[in-house]
Curated annotation (Swiss-Prot):
A Pfam family it matches: DMRL_synthase
Catalytic activities: (2S)-2-hydroxy-3-oxobutyl phosphate + 5-amino-6-(D-ribitylamino)uracil = 6,7-dimethyl-8-(1-D-ribityl)lumazine + phosphate + 2 H2O + H(+)
The organism of origin for this protein: Anaeromyxobacter sp. (strain Fw109-5)
Recorded family membership: Belongs to the DMRL synthase family.
Domain of life: Bacteria
One Gene Ontology term from the biological process aspect of the record: riboflavin biosynthetic process
Hydrolase as UniProt keyword: no
The protein's role, per its UniProt record: Catalyzes the formation of 6,7-dimethyl-8-ribityllumazine by condensation of 5-amino-6-(D-ribitylamino)uracil with 3,4-dihydroxy-2-butanone 4-phosphate. This is the penultimate step in the biosynthesis of riboflavin.
Protein name per Swiss-Prot or TrEMBL: 6,7-dimethyl-8-ribityllumazine synthase
An annotated Gene Ontology molecular function: 6,7-dimethyl-8-ribityllumazine synthase activity
Amino acid sequence: MNVYEGSLVATGLKVGLVVARFNSLVTEQLLVGAADALRRHGVKDGDIDVFRCPGTFELPALLRRVARSARYDAVVALGAVIRGGTPHFEYVAGEATKGVAQIALESDCAVSMGILTCDTLEQALERAGVKAGNKGAEAAVAAVEQANVLREAAKVPSPRRAE
């Protein structure tokens, strides 16, 4: 049995962080957490690029452009959708999630999602590191691991065909 896993060593990786400006009180903390986690795992500041878009609904379009640029080993979507009194929350959260998932399937680079979907601002801030843990950092570490396992998977030889 052969087992392939991604390491958490990010030395030499180039990472694109795509951040929604809407709910910036939360998304800026996700960005801080993601960038800090990448540095702690070995990514140099010069190998981290930050792209900002208006909101979480717009994230997938920019994320796809960044992922397709072939400049990055990994891209991370960072956003926050907070429930309000209308169905808008479900539409934005659902479509953003579908968009990120589609990009992950179509892309040659690792794609990770750090989009919070919370009932309250307080919940979002907690998940952005105010109390404990930072989902932006977790998404960045997942991107590192996925980038490394994708590299390993690319090295797996094709099966030989019987002639």
